[in-house]
């Protein structure tokens, strides 16, 4: 059974120009650029948490997938096991996190990398703005 709900193909091989989390507004905005120079903006709303690693100056995305909540807990079991007791992402236990994600309709967006930045965003909605 596939964990992928949908793929966002507009981001393949895009360079990341910038990203900004607005914790007060519960949002995260990422601006990317295609190889041909077109801008693609990604706007997450209803942000619960995000986790990025391997962030460098010249990040190139492989793509982004929305995955199932079960898939998220399988894929990030080790990370969550070590971090949830420190309040990341926003709960005291794995069970509480799952309940909150269900209650608040939080979706899981996994960002894969060709170079640099990768990780996930937990948010209610995502919108891509393409030219």
Predicted regions and their residues:
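Surface-exposed, interaction-prone regions used to assemble/regulate multi-protein complexes
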Residues: 1-131
């Amino acid at each position: 059974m596939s964990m992928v709900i949908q793929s966002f193909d507009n981001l393949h091989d895009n360079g990341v120009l910038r990203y900004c989390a607005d914790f007060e507004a519960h949002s995260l905005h990422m601006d990317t650029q295609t190889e041909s120079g077109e801008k693609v903006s990604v706007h997450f709303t209803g942000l619960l948490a995000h986790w990025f690693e391997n962030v460098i100056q010249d990040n190139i995305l492989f793509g982004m997938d929305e995955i199932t909540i079960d898939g998220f807990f399988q894929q990030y079991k080790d990370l969550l096991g070590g971090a949830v007791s420190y309040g990341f992402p926003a709960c005291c236990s794995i069970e509480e996190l799952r309940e909150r994600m269900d209650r608040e309709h939080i979706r899981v967006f996994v960002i894969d990398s060709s170079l640099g930045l990768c990780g996930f965003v937990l948010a209610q909605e995502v919108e891509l703005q393409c030219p």
